[in-house]
Design a protein with these regions (language model features):
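Extracellular S/T/G-rich loop segment that most often corresponds to the catalytic His/Ser-adjacent loop
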Residues: 421-519
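A short beta-strand micro-motif common to beta-rich folds, especially ectodomain repeats
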Residues: 648-661, 666-668
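Inhibitory N-terminal propeptides of secreted protease zymogens
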Residues: 25-158
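C-terminal subdomain of the subtilisin-like protease fold in secreted/lumenal serine endopeptidases
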Residues: 348-355, 363, 405, 519-609, ...
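Protease zymogen maturation seam
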Residues: 99-112, 126-222, 230-236, 240, ...
Length: 679
């Protein structure tokens, strides 16, 4: 339930200013609607200040060393005095390497205020909303899982998994012994869980068969898994885990200056520490399961396969763990926003998000609390979340890399609802619905016009036998959970494998396909904007509306005796499940799309040098490099690596000639204070 509080702002207040050259905007005298969602944290308000306040705020933060008790703005501080504020700090810590774009995006103007929890939050919002210097207000609150934390997945130990061998008719491309359970990658129509009522159709999968002949991954593509912690030491994941070189666990210092201590494998935004945890009471292994679908190590002779996990002589994509849930606890909205920015600033180009608010059309009788109904309502309720997402979408990647901007991929939700949840439904995100192994919508999946893509997510309510356990023995004499998604898992700190279902499982299929596509684009020397790549994922996906005919029968709470059958009218889902993401079709579409990669311009300081691998930009072997003015800089090529050595300030041109005579050009700028970045 949401509360809407209408406030008529007071007349302009007489306000002093610490700097006579900085004017404070007049307060808005039009009626203002302040929205405080249920579950808002007492004693905390998140404020975005007007741009005119930048100098005052910077001065306050400089004096305080990063955390203060007051803003330095007299009118704001009068209210903070009344509220008993004891903490005033930037939402986003300073990362010197990315501070310029942080300011360009306006994220440096977001602050979190902590005050006496006994103060009425509504009155705090009323007081602050009247201030002309306040641009936006938002509550803080813990984020919620969109999946059931009490689910009990069937668990298979590593030892048991490695004892299995595939005998299925399909010729699998990798030697991972459990790959035969992963119908979601290559579905040949022979899965053992098919029944007369609930069938299996060949091709209802992620399209990996064709894709894996073209590409298996690339270690320079980084996927940020925003979820429970990923078990970075899992035997089937450890070789594909992102490592922040230079940082060490338990060192107690920020070695790379990015504002985060000990973040070697990612960061725990629940406990604000670089030590991520998958053993806390209430941990479900959800993040580890998601990560395995994207990048479990392929062809390593153990466990399962990942869509972009490498193999055939190639390394897989890298998984960055962004911990939003830790046991029974979750991070706040402020920390969630930090997490999104952290992912962009540390090299991730895909946000994998199997969580979100409940759909606005979810049924309250079933225990769901409906979330935002429109993009405008979501943006008004959670403006910080939207701006952090926009930052990732706009600033992740590189204009000189395979993608400029990032892809934010979200599960549509599991509330059986006729609208996607937010943030998935945001028009710049990719909302993912779930299908069963016969192309039909999964019984639980949210759907609607906001959904862009769908992927296998399992459907136990469809394939399960009413009144019986989902755990059955397959043709190998091994326990199998009917029609669910099999991946890496950790339970009670023990690495293994297991089954889950949900749009949470469909989502990483799309993230894995996106990662594989970017790996192939790099292989083909293609460059895309995030918007272009998002559109290509959609147009290359398969239209499956023709399968939505007649009715589908499923049993909610089907393991209980006397479960009631429920009928789905499949025609209701036409045009509302998106298109079926297809790895093979995407890779083929990448050929000839986007634009050629080209040599980036370079800016560096005098008496420094930098280098890059020419194979990332030029398809032919380079023969030599020439700099027009050798007094400014020189260039050499050795083993395909171009090295630029700066001498004195100035600007000059660089040409790289291939063995066939083709020339590639770039500009070299040498100036004091440059950070040696490719532009």
């Amino acid at each position: 339930m949401r509360r809407y509080i209408t406030i008529v702002a007071a007349a302009a207040l007489a306000m002093g200013c610490v700097n006579e050259n900085i004017s404070i905007p007049s307060p808005d005298t039009t009626p203002t609607t302040v929205v405080i969602p249920e579950g808002a944290t007492a004693g905390e308000v998140i404020i975005k200040f007007a741009p005119e306040m930048e100098a005052i705020l910077d001065q306050t933060m400089t004096r305080s060393g990063g955390e203060a008790t007051r803003s330095g703005i007299p009118s704001t501080d009068e209210v903070l005095d009344i509220l008993g504020a004891y903490s005033f700090e930037r939402v986003f810590p300073i990362d010197s390497a990315n501070e310029a774009r942080t300011r360009e995006a306006g994220l440096h103007l977001w602050y979190i205020v902590r005050f006496d929890e006994g103060e009425d939050l509504q009155q705090a919002f009323e007081r602050l909303s009247k201030l002309g210097e306040v641009d936006k207000l938002q509550c803080n609150r813990p984020i919620a899982r969109a999946y059931n934390p009490n689910a009990n997945p069937m668990f298979v130990s590593c030892a048991e998994a490695d004892s299995h061998a595939a005998t299925r008719a399909t010729a699998w491309p990798f030697n991972d012994p459990e790959i035969y359970r992963q119908w979601c990658y290559i579905n040949d129509g022979t899965a053992p869980f098919a029944t007369e009522r609930a069938g299996v159709l060949a091709g209802a999968d992620a399209g990996c068969a064709e894709a894996w002949d073209m590409c298996t991954g690339d270690e320079e593509i980084i996927v940020a898994v925003m979820d429970e912690a990923v078990m970075w030491s899992h035997p089937d994941l450890k070789d594909n885990i992102w490592v922040n070189e230079g940082e060490e666990l338990y060192a107690g210092k920020d070695a790379d200056g990015n504002g985060y201590i000990d973040d070697r494998y990612g960061y725990n935004f629940v406990r604000d520490t670089g030590i991520t945890s998958w053993t806390s009471n209430g941990s479900t292994g959800h993040g580890t399961h998601v990560a395995g679908t994207i990048a479990a190590v392929n062809d390593n002779g153990i466990g399962v396969a990942g869509i972009a996990g490498g193999g055939k002589g190639k390394r897989g994509v890298k998984i960055m763990t962004i911990q939003l849930f830790d046991g029974m606890n979750s991070c706040s909205l402020a920390m969630e926003a930090r997490a999104m920015k952290y992912a962009a600033d540390n090299g991730a180009v895909i946000l994998q998000c199997s969580w979100g608010y409940h759909s606005s059309k979810s049924n309250m009788i079933m225990g769901y609390i409906p979330g935002p109904a429109t993009e405008e309502e979501w943006a008004a309720l959670y403006p910080l979340e939207k701006e952090a997402l926009d930052y990732f979408i706009n600033y992740a990647g590189s204009p000189n890399g395979v993608i400029e901007g990032g892809l934010a991929i979200f599960a549509s939700g599991n509330e059986y609802a006729a609208q996607s949840s937010f943030p998935a439904a945001y028009s710049k995100c990719i909302s993912v619905a779930a299908i069963a192994a016969d192309y039909t919508p999964a019984s639980y999946s949210n759907y609607g016009s906001e959904v862009l893509l769908c992927a296998p997510g399992g459907d136990l309510e469809y394939y399960g036998t009413p009144g019986m356990s989902d755990n059955i023995y397959d043709e190998h004499g091994v326990l199998n959970q009917q029609g669910a998604i099999y991946s890496t898992l950790v339970i009670d700190g023990v690495a293994g494998y297991g089954y889950y279902e949900g749009t949470s499982m469909a989502c990483p299929h799309v993230s894995g396909i996106a990662a594989l596509g970017l790996a192939y684009a790099k292989q083909q020397h293609r460059h895309f904007t995030s918007e272009e790549f998002r559109e290509l994922m959609y147009t290359s996906a398969r239209d499956i509306d023709d399968y939505f005919v007649g009715e589908k029968l499923y049993y909610m709470r089907h393991e209980s005796a006397g479960a009631t059958p429920i009928k789905m009218n499949l025609a209701d889902y036409r045009g509302k499940m998106g298109r079926l993401a297809d790895a093979g079709a995407l890779l083929k579409a990448i050929e000839g799309s986007g634009r050629d990669m080209r040599l980036p311009n370079i800016c560096l300081a005098p008496n420094t040098l930098t280098s890059l691998n020419l194979a990332d930009y030029i398809t032919e072997e380079a023969a030599n490099a020439e700099v027009a003015n050798s007094e400014i800089a020189t260039a050499t090529i050795e083993a395909g690596v171009l090295t630029i050595s700066a001498k004195s300030e100035g600007q000059t041109s660089l040409s790289v000639t291939t063995k066939s005579g083709t020339k590639h050009y770039a500009t070299i700028t040498v100036r004091a204070g440059a950070d040696n970045g490719w532009l």
